[in-house]
């Protein structure tokens, strides 16, 4: 039954894939199955609320029962865009199709490093994938002693520049990052984000400050979020959603410190009266466990998330819609440290709706189309609404 929901709560479990996509081989990801492999490694996952919603009706997950009739509609979605990074996944969810993938570098090319050194007048050290705290432990003192800029990346499309605020003034760091942003918008670099990472302190006690600044790419076209904002509806970003969309279409942005903080913020929004979309990204699955190839930690984080769903269920109103999905895979048993090209789960729950099999959706954009359809705003160019199937 098609029905208009006053509030839509969209939760992206960052990197929680549910099995190799049809084109997985092109990405080197044959056999990837984030949820399945975590469940195997832990001899089953204890996730009674996701079981209730119908997770194992999409694809059997060890320990997650499919015995009872699900209370939510369920299915899985295939990505059609050319990349498997966070920005690509989220942009496609909101109705865009990305045909030129953002680039991910193990090491930035000498040409790019040379241009940054010439512009800044400073040497560059690092130039490798690293966690922000580890790279400071390793290179922080050298930076303070020499004034060289610390450049590092991750398994996402990002270039980060760290500098001590007493060595490189903030305005100078921001100016360098703006230059980096300008020269990496297109091929051959095509980077999703440049991040200024200022810090203070001394060896053994470095502290990253709140003066971080992200220089993202704006979505190349209007997304469903833009259409909601234009229509005067609320678009509440929780976690890194606002960064992913460079603030486009966001009416209220609330940062989060962790998955559990994200769930705390979600509960607060459930207690708030608004009309529109509340969009949450839970990044710990990806950042702390997927890239670090830690299936035990990943499994524990999934179970902790599941335990919090009861608070969500209790607060949902009759005219609320809860959608749980992911943006790509990151199988912690798969070789390497990169994302994996997978289907993502789709669980759609309302207290007033029946449970339907939504099948395999041919693009993540079906989700955005459904949100647009619900609020009677302009439909995205990509995606087919499943609102009438609920």
Curated annotation (Swiss-Prot):
Substrates-to-products reaction catalysed: 2-deoxy-alpha-D-ribose 1-phosphate = 2-deoxy-D-ribose 5-phosphate; alpha-D-ribose 1-phosphate = D-ribose 5-phosphate
Taxonomy, superkingdom: Bacteria
GO cellular component terms listed in the entry, alphabetical order: cytosol
Residues given in the record as Mn(2+) 1 binding sites: 14, 327-328
SUPFAM superfamilies: Alkaline phosphatase-like, DeoB insert domain-like
GO molecular function: magnesium ion binding; manganese ion binding; phosphopentomutase activity
GO terms under biological process: 2-deoxyribose 1-phosphate catabolic process; 5-phosphoribose 1-diphosphate biosynthetic process; metabolic compound salvage; nucleotide metabolic process
Cofactors, names only: Mn(2+)
Keyword line: Cytoplasm, Isomerase, Manganese, Metal-binding
Pathway annotation: Carbohydrate degradation; 2-deoxy-D-ribose 1-phosphate degradation; D-glyceraldehyde 3-phosphate and acetaldehyde from 2-deoxy-alpha-D-ribose 1-phosphate: step 1/2
Protein name: Phosphopentomutase
Organism: Exiguobacterium sibiricum (strain DSM 17290 / CCUG 55495 / CIP 109462 / JCM 13490 / 255-15)
């Amino acid at each position: 039954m098609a029905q208009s929901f006053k509030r839509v709560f969209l939760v992206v479990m960052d990197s929680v894939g549910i099995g190799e996509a049809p084109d997985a081989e092109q990405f080197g990801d044959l056999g990837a199955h984030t949820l399945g492999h975590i469940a195997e490694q832990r001899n089953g996952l204890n996730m009674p609320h996701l079981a209730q919603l119908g997770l194992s009706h999409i694809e059997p997950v060890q320990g997650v029962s499919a015995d009872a009739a699900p209370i939510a509609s369920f299915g899985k979605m295939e990505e059609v865009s050319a990349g498997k990074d966070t920005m690509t996944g989220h942009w496609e969810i909101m109705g865009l199709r990305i045909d030129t993938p953002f680039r991910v570098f193990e090491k930035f090319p000498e040409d790019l490093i040379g241009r940054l050194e010439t512009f800044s007048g400073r040497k560059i050290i690092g130039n490798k994938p690293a966690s922000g705290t580890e790279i400071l432990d390793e290179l922080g003192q050298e930076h303070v002693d020499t004034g060289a800029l610390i450049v590092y990346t991750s398994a996402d499309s990002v270039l980060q520049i760290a500098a001590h605020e007493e060595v490189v003034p903030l305005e100078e760091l921001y100016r360098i990052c703006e230059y980096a942003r300008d020269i990496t918008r297109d091929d051959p670099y095509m980077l999703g984000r440049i991040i200024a990472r200022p810090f203070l302190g001394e060896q053994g006690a470095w502290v990253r400050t709140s003066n971080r600044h992200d220089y993202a790419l704006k979505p190349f076209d209007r997304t469903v979020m833009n259409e909601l904002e234009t229509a005067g509806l609320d678009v509440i970003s929780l976690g890194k959603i606002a960064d992913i969309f460079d603030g486009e279409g966001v009416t209220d942005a609330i940062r989060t410190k962790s998955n559990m903080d994200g769930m705390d913020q979600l509960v607060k929004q459930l207690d708030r009266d608004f009309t529109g979309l509340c969009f949450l990204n839970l990044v710990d699955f990806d950042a702390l466990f997927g890239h670090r190839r830690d299936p035990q930690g990943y499994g524990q984080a999934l179970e902790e998330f599941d335990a919090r769903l009861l608070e969500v269920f209790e607060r949902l109103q009759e005219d609320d819609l809860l959608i749980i999905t992911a943006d790509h895979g990151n199988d912690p048993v798969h070789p390497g440290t990169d994302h994996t090209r997978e289907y993502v789960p789709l669980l759609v729950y309302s207290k007033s709706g029946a449970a339907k099999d939504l099948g395999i959706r041919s693009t993540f954009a079906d989700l955005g189309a459904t949100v647009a359809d619900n609020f009677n705003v302009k439909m995205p160019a990509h995606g087919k609404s499943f609102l009438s199937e609920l």
